[in-house]
Amino acid sequence: MAAPGALLVMGVSGSGKSTVGALLASELGWKFYDADDYHPEENRRKMGKGIPLNDQDRIPWLCNLHDILLRDVASGQRVVLACSALKKTYRDILTQGKDGVALKCEESGKEAKQAEMQLLVVHLSGSFEVISGRLLKREGHFMPPELLQSQFETLEPPAAPENFIQISVDKNVSEIIATIMETLKMK
């Protein structure tokens, strides 16, 4: 596989996606997006009330993120995206657009899209106990710790043929960044 045009830092809430993604983008000199910043207000309210999002909530949000990634990568900008992307279908939407879902992504059907976006998925994984402990310490986030169990239930960890690496959140942030950088050197 060619070097990725984009990196997806994924995992459940509290896995460190935003922290790792922002530091990684800074280290690489790539553009950084935090998918949480693109949730519609309705999604934020729903999660704030402790109601898990369903596919109908997530698909328009993922399509929007796909369109942003596609525009940047097509213009030569390399990107790091921090996004839960819990299901393979969600990761497919990020790389391929609306294929396989009932909703059309704005950019997906345009002729400028020559091929599937080259994406390296970085799955930050950890136990429920470790991650729930992190969430309990976090302040000011719209995602309440009570929704973590539903995220673990929804999670479909990446598997072949996806282009991915899995890194334990038991490592410190600098070890995680070093592992990702080493992986990129091999691509």
From Swiss-Prot:
InterPro entries under this entry? P-loop_NTPase, Shikimate/glucono_kinase, Therm_gnt_kin
Q: Which Pfam families does the UniProt record give?
A: SKI (PF01202)
Q: Which GO terms describe its molecular function?
A: ATP binding; gluconokinase activity
Q: What class of enzyme is it?
A: transferase
Q: Where does ATP bind?
A: 11-18
> Which keywords fit this entry according to its UniProt record?
ATP-binding, Kinase, Nucleotide-binding, Transferase
EC numbers: 2.7.1.12
Catalysed reaction(s)? D-gluconate + ATP = 6-phospho-D-gluconate + ADP + H(+)
Question: Which residues does UniProt assign to the signal peptide?
Answer: none
Q: What is this protein called?
A: Probable gluconokinase
Which species is this UniProt entry from? Homo sapiens
Recorded name of the encoding gene: IDNK
